[in-house]
């Protein structure tokens, strides 16, 4: 891999793109350390210590710790993720949006523009909610209207800037910019999470108990990583045969090919969407100071918090786990239906003289692809749930409250593999052997 990286940096275009990505990520990390004027940067550090909700841990992981530091990038790209979820869901209800989605490059540009506007709106809403909810509670000393405007402006502008940086990375760098920013934010939390695990389970224990705890932690992490790699690498290849035909005096066709269908067809999207939807109500209600107490609202918020899903003393809150699993499965099917259309694939195969051995072209081919795809989606969604739930289990039973869990590993591994594929494709154009063949 080091040799391949060396070869990649020998290619001017790839080298320029990689340096651009690194430069933008440095800007992101510097921005995450710049405090908002007039804000007590220690407020959320102390507040986090008194909270049992994991929704803010999840949120803070996505911001790379910027939220607890109350930097200008405190909201990070979470408004963009939420707006993407909203737009994707609205494509079901509004045919205009659905047509845009299927209208090629022009339609995607329009949807991207709409997503930007929704992102700014959500950033403004979250900024105002945070300022109102915590401003008079110590977040903003000597709170007044002008200070509130400054905080709201900084938070909204920071989120908009990250959205712009993500789009620039996608266009001028390698990989998906938003995903890369999300990955670097998550990775930046790994050292502190490992330190938390060490202090909680190893430090102060006897040598035998400490070694056993460390071994279990490493084993769990390795198992989750292996499961993630298997999920991302699993592919079902559907064989395709092309019939021979005469073109002038030449016989064309007769070649064999295949349709690669990934086991994890939707990637990390179902996990991000499901986790964001589960966390969003908790975050908003907490920001505006409505935690629900012991009423119905309080019980609902507890059910939405993964810390309570495996709590032996309160098993009723495991209903939240059921909702989470259903959301992951739903988004897996939903997102795959957007990115892969069996009817279009079957029609294109028929037009090109292709067929699946043993399956008639047209409608039977479409039904066959739908059947295989449905099976793969379910397996992929089940795998995603297992990987995501393992850390929830240890969190609920043993109190291992860290932000770097199964969801984070899925995101990091998925983004790294996808970025490497893009680097590989750019290198193959110039006849360089790359990562994936090694």
Where are these regions (language model features)?
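N-terminal cationic and glycine-rich segments that engage phosphates or anionic surfaces
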Residues: 1-101, 105-438
